[in-house]
Amino acid sequence: NRSINAAERKADWWLFGGIYRPVWLEVLPQVHMEHFVLNADHHGKLQTAVDMAGDAKGHEIIVSVRSLKDGKTVYTSNGQTTITHPINNSDKEQMISGEWASIIPWSTENPNLYVAKLELKNPEGKIVQTRETRIGFRTVEFFPQDGVYLNGTKLVVKGINRHSFSVDGGRTTSAALSRMDALLIKEMNMNAVRSHYPPDEHFLDMCDSLGLVYMDELAGWQNGYDSKVGAKLVKEMIERDVNHPCIILWNNGNEGGWNTQTDPLFAQYDRLQKRHMVHPWADFNDLDTHHYPTYLTGVARFTNGYKVFMPTEFMHAMYDQGGGAGLRDFWDRWCTNPLFAGGFIWVYCDEAPKRSDKGGILDSDKSNAPDGVVGPRREKEGSYYAIRAQ
């Protein structure tokens, strides 16, 4: 498919072969929960949409919530430990709503997590399937000419872009590396991350656990997927990531790499929360995300514009000449305007794999990829400390 070649293989400095994400097969009963979407708000209300496979009439779905920290059961507002939803029809989608008492909301300062458990009971009273996922009770909202809100409080993202990259594995990463990266980003006093494609899910798990908000993006740089491929990949991305509390925004491609025909699919698949979707480096959907604005360009966008301003790339850190250099001047001035919603520095780490075919050198593809605020093995550069001090 030419659009895949354009959107992916021409969209990065490094291309690797093979399978570098987990792949598995799952055996399921004939009637089962195929997919479920959650919306847990900061007041304790939990909406659940469950897509059933097979005729589930006569089955029951049982929902319970426990604390991830100590495993204690969370009670509903009427003192019950579970919510039972009898399936009285053959509809594919089953909607379940309830309210849970005394929850602690998820936030960047206090990323409190719970585990939601869904059990499917057949007409004979036997549990035939159990699904669990971690959740955070939080509310994400976007208001035009205002900004992004988390739990009713305006959020200014102090963000950085991150490639999924390791010296020895290329695009193959590990949970340990994801944890290291998330901790280093938190140590820079940052609260947000963006990437050019859906990351390994264990990185989203770390963002959930450590309190980093995330911009989840469909791949595509300057060239987008065609509608057939794009629709499939939007569906797969959102269905995989939709229940992560860290995700606050969706991105459709990068710097022209979007297909507007797939834009409506984001709200369709994020059916309960309908989080805001943007086009990086564009005035789109009430959000100005233009990249690499100069100091005065940024000021002019506030003075003459009316859209929320959130550059999804700025302060390019090539050879550490950007990143923290001049950040205080930019940040302090831009923060004086209520339209400023924060931004994302380019980029987190140098992408330099160890080349076994070149004597073991770390190859950053000349000047294309040594653009991180940390080195390829996560060595702290000058910008790391400057950003941390901001």
List where the protein language model places each region:
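Secreted/periplasmic carbohydrate-active enzymes, especially glycoside hydrolases
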Residues: 1-201, 205-209, 214, 232-236, ...
